A protein has these predicted regions:
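Bacterial Sec-dependent N-terminal signal peptides
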Residues: 18-40
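Active-site metal-binding motif and surrounding structural segment of the metallo-beta-lactamase
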Residues: 151-196
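Bacterial N-terminal signal peptides that target proteins for export
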Residues: 1-10
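Short gly/pro/ser/thr-enriched loop/turn and capping motifs at secondary-structure boundaries
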Residues: 198-200
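Intrinsically disordered, low-complexity regions of eukaryotic proteins
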Residues: 4, 25-28, 212
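Intrinsic structural disorder/low-complexity segments
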Residues: 11, 175, 253-254
Length: 254
């Protein structure tokens, strides 16, 4: 993987040199040529994102569906190998790629919005804040704590300082991030799963278990993965988020 990343980074550097070489020496404006295109892309995607975020997911009206269709159009134009290179590239290369593709720009903007909410939002007593994070992941913040479940994202490891524990329902790559898992282990924070470590690790749940982490009361059980023939593959989490949320219970079983 390191060799692949080095090759990708070298190709990115050569591409960047090509853009510089093609620049017009007599025109130093950052609003023309390649830079101008990037600025227009950012402005368009920012406007689309704000249209989505200013609407309610509970009300599916024409405005929201039109915005979602536009975002789907961004995704349809992104080649899978380009997205894979973005996910696996060095941080600097991936950050630069975000400026060149609308769906990747949106992908990062959505993550930054979630991070801002986790770090800065104040959760009132009797409530909980919930963010859906591409594509199976959730982050839940309460007045007294924060946890995440099934997070798979290029920048997932940035969540580690701000969450108290992480849950992973099963070993499918769209449900976990190795970088985030390792960051949590490095910080000495609990990672609940049925496969990451053997049963000597207290947070390995291969069946019915009960945990208390802060004000969170967690129950686990094991189940099969839909019709894929994977028996006892998925851990179901039932998480009582505490009295300061009105004993809100979050359940995740995907």
């Amino acid at each position: 993987m390191d060799i692949i990343r080095k090759i990708q980074y070298l190709l990115f550097c050569l591409l960047a040199i090509g853009f510089v070489a093609c620049d017009d020496d007599d025109n130093n404006s950052t609003e023309t040529g390649h830079e101008g295109i990037l600025t227009q892309l950012a402005e368009e995607v920012d406007a689309t994102a704000q249209q989505l975020w200013s609407s309610s997911p509970l009300i599916v009206n024409t405005g929201r569906t039109t915005t979602l269709t536009k975002i789907q159009g961004y995704a349809d134009k992104c080649k899978d190998d380009y997205f894979i290179s973005y996910l696996n590239g060095f941080d600097q290369a991936s950050t630069s790629m975000e400026k060149c593709d609308p769906i990747i720009y949106f992908y990062r903007s959505a993550f930054d919005r979630v991070m801002d909410g986790i770090k800065n939002s104040k959760v009132e007593n009797g409530t909980a804040a919930i963010w859906l994070l591409y594509n199976m992941g959730y982050v839940v913040k309460t007045p007294s704590g924060c946890f995440a479940i099934d997070i798979s994202h290029r920048w997932a490891k940035e969540l580690a300082p701000y969450i108290d524990f992480l849950c992973v329902t099963h070993k499918h790559s769209d449900h976990y991030s190795n970088d985030l898992i390792q960051a949590m282990f490095d910080l000495g924070k609990p990672v609940l799963s049925n496969y990451l470590k053997d049963t000597t690790y207290p947070y390995t749940a291969k069946g019915d278990k009960d945990y208390e982490i802060g004000k969170f009361k967690i129950k686990t059980c094991i189940t099969d993965h839909n019709n894929a023939g994977l028996s006892n593959f998925v851990t179901v989490f039932s998480i009582n988020c505490g009295e300061d949320t009105g004993n809100f219970v979050f359940m995740q079983d995907r």
